[in-house]
């Protein structure tokens, strides 16, 4: 499958790198990372230890079988505008936050799938991405249920990623948001690593943030 990873930062580079052995992958990212991948390949470190050789560019291709969108959610509208007019069979958001699928669908003609990803990734140097934790990808129609397209994309991703095709993506998106609210926001504000929330004084704040998200959901 011809796969474009739009947003080749930490997560996008890791996901694209893990798929590059079995698919024709193009990473769309920024310099100097793109230049390094072109010159030396993409080095996978941490939980994985190998070098792969995806394509790398700063501009999205005009066509692809699948686009994986991994930009930060505040960049979704800009990414959607850049992808508009492209000939794609499917677009899959692997982003945090809510509403990314609707933003993408308003610009691209291809069907949009929802997804979550729990792999940990860190871009340590240009051309080098470290996997800090092996997780999984869940994907499916953004309104829930099943589809032949989701099954086909899930089969393709399973070549390099732990993949689940799920019929309850709305629930999974909210659950991921609750986890992010309870962990990411609190650790950033308290300037502590994730593990300090388990028994530290910020545990109550993390619990309350996740619970509030669940009530909103």
Residue ranges, per PLM feature:
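NAD(P)+-binding Rossmann beta1-loop-alpha1 motif at the extreme N-terminus of oxidoreductases
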Residues: 1-50
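Hydrophobic anchor at the start of a short beta-strand
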Residues: 3, 24-25, 91, 112, ...
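Short amphipathic alpha-helical segments
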Residues: 16-18, 39, 80-83, 103-106, ...
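Glycine-rich beta-alpha junction loops
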Residues: 32, 96-98, 116-121, 135, ...
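Short, charged/polar "capping" segments at the starts of alpha-helices
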Residues: 33-38, 100-102, 147-148
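Rossmann-like NAD(P)(H) cofactor-binding subdomain of soluble oxidoreductases
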Residues: 45-130
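Internal alpha-helical scaffold of NAD(P)-dependent oxidoreductase catalytic cores
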Residues: 86, 103, 107, 130-177, ...
């Amino acid at each position: 499958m011809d796969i474009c990873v739009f947003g080749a930062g930490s997560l996008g580079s890791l996901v694209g790198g893990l798929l590059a052995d079995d698919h024709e992958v193009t990473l769309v990212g920024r310099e100097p990372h793109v230049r390094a991948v072109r010159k030396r390949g993409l080095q996978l470190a941490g939980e994985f230890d190998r070098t792969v050789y995806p394509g790398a560019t700063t501009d999205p291709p005009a066509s692809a079988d699948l686009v994986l969108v991994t930009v930060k959610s505040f960049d979704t509208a800009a990414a959607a505008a850049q992808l508009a007019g492209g000939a794609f069979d499917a677009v899959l958001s692997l982003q945090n936050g809510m509403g990314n699928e609707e933003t993408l669908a308003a610009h691209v003609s291809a069907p949009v799938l929802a997804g979550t990803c729990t792999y940990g990734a860190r871009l340590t140097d240009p051309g080098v991405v470290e996997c800090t934790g092996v997780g999984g990808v869940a994907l499916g129609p953004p309104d829930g249920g099943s589809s032949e397209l989701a099954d086909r994309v899930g089969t393709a991703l399973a070549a390099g990623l732990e993949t689940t095709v799920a019929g309850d993506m709305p629930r999974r998106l909210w659950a991921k948001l609750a986890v992010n609210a309870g962990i990411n926001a609190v650790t950033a504000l308290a300037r502590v690593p994730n593990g300090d929330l388990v028994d530290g004084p910020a545990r109550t704040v993390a619990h309350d943030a996740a619970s509030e998200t669940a009530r909103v959901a």
